[in-house]
Amino acid sequence: NIRYILGFMFSGILIYGIYEYVVSVDYTKDINKLKNQLEQNEKLVKDNKDNYMVKLKEEEDNWQKKLQTLEEDESKLDEIVTNLPVVGIGDSVLLGAVNNLYNRFPNGYFDGKVSRTAWGINDILLTLKNNNVLGNPIVFNLGTNGDCSLECKEEILRTCEDRDIFWINTVNLTDVNVRLNNLASSHSNLHIIDWYSISRGHNEYFTYDGIHLTNEGRKVYTDTIYNAIYNIYKEKYIEKK
């Protein structure tokens, strides 16, 4: 009997030890790696701001010529979309992908910041607009850290005027996504990028927290943004024809 009791106790201790190991997985290494990547990308954002202003002016000068070229050859659409003066503003999800975004949109400007919400974004837009460097289209990755009011979002859209806006929804706050869809239903220039559905079931896209992106996730995220912009511009091209 003592042997059975001791065996039972040993089994209990072993199971408890395994449980403790599973629930106390140390993510310190992953957290530090993500933190270092975001800090490096913040520097990249600052370094590219002045360069964007120069490129935007050059693109404005060449824009009409490019549109004429597109009328003659639809295959040029990829080149045109790639060279758009895209403005991307977002939180640490976008910040983590800025290298990929600059590679895909070399004439773009991307401003990502850790823990950013949509509150206060209008001031950033106004600064760009007042300096004549608010490009088109505009990409937002905002909502992961919480929503802002309807009036806050309406103010953002008013500042953007008739520019095409691509707002990426969240993977963690479905109520934010519902409100974004409702907002888009009354604004024809607001296009929702459904990152929630596209990324669902793809754990390989995410780091330990299920929100920030792995290398593979950043590639898919960037491709998703590009495809959304490309499809809208293609629709406009077809309508124009």
Stretch-by-stretch model annotation:
Residues 1-85, 99, 226, 230-241:
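N-terminal secretory targeting modules
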Residues 23, 27-33, 163-200:
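Substrate-gating cap/lid alpha-helix
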Residues 79-152, 172-177:
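Conserved SGNH/GDSL esterase-like catalytic core that processes O-acyl groups on lipids
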Residues 87, 95, 99, 103, ...:
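Solvent-exposed, polar/charged alpha-helical surfaces in well-ordered, non-transmembrane soluble domains
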Residues 100-108, 128-133, 155-163, 167, ...:
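Alpha-helix C-terminal capping segments
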Residues 177-241:
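Catalytic His-Asp segment of secreted/periplasmic serine-dependent ester chemistry enzymes
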